[in-house]
Amino acid sequence: MLARIRVRRGVPFNLHHDVRLHSSVGRAPVRLREALFSDFKDVTELKCRCGLLPDSLQNWERLWRHNPALQQGSFERPIGWVLEVEGRLVGYLGNISLSYYYGDRALTAVTGAGFAVEPAYRAVSLSLVAAFYRQRSVDLYLTTTAIEAVGKIARAFKSDPLPQADYETVLFWVLQPYHFTQAVMKKLKLSPTLSHVGGMLTSLLLGTDTIVRRRWPTRGSAGLPVSEIGVDQIGDDFQGLWMEKLKEMPRLLADRSPAALRWHFEIPTDAGTARVLCCRDNGDLLGYAAILSDQDQTTGLRRSMVADMLVKQDDPAILRALLIAAYNHAKRVGSHVLEVLGFPYSIRQVCSQWNSYRRKYPACPFYYKAADPTLHKTFSDGRAWYATPFDGDTTLMF
């Protein structure tokens, strides 16, 4: 199947008509077609069968009817593709439109989301990915939450791993050692006795290590107050910061206009946990950090994440002020851990000053492909990126 797709890469692709595929399972043909909004219920059931968290109808409305990036296109882009056998969905890949900028150049981007295929039909699942990469009028293809197997598929379609250094390494601070270690024990599926004893001992060691090594933000920035607002309070001053950021050194940046920020972080099922920390000087917005908090339903781990952060000239003093505020916010809302994923080296260096712990993904979760070979080569330089959890679908489904 993969070889056949490679041969056909140069063939124009259009899915206004269904495509019939052959599967080794049974005799019924597999149909590949564009997803419809009316497929929501069937996609939800498919995700549940595949062990994935289902989406909400409200989030579908947000992603494919209220997305600011869709207003910039001259045609209606597919919301995704499905595999269908005798009227039953057996595969799905969502397709989310995004706007990016590289210097003064506007780019149309898409990111895959919610990839789900029943095991019996994995042999034809690559047709979903082929449809994604054969879209017309796209400058940049992104995959930002890939497990190892999905990463291999992305490489087969000539996507490359993100060259930004250490994106796959998460920096984190433990805020509540006991609750953190209890969540780890649950993930390891130990017996209640071992979990209790092991958790007590580990949390004691972890707490001691945190104090001895001073693993928390300690140095504030005098004269740089930080305030907290809701997503719906993101105003015109964010537009000024965004415009200034675009004039700095050329880097690939997802659209951070006020409308794009509000759309991204106003998640229907979020219940108001997304907050924005703002650092201002005499009313001038110097930078912001968006914080998302959630709880793992299996382990009980409460996590806060720096989902995005934008600061004038990447000023270390402003970054420190925002990170200290993020740490204090995470403690205040009862999170067990605060995480930082991604960001360029200069920003990670500021985070690392406070002796964070580190954990690494088993494989790179972020892949990209630019339609223009020259642009793709430009993006092979890690310095051209400003990749954060704001990119792709990393926090769109948080």
Task: Give the location of each predicted region.
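Internal, well-ordered domain-core segments that constitute the primary functional module
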Residues: S97-L171
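A conserved beta-strand-loop-helix scaffold within acyl/acetyltransferase catalytic domains
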Residues: V30-F115, V226-V311
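Active-site/acyl-donor-binding loops of N-acyltransferases
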Residues: L2, F13-R20, R62-L63, L140-R213, ...
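Short, hydrophobic/aromatic alpha-helical segments in well-folded domains
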Residues: S127-A131, A260, H264, A325
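Conserved N-terminal entry element of GNAT/NAT acetyltransferase domains
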Residues: L2, V7-S38, L205-D236
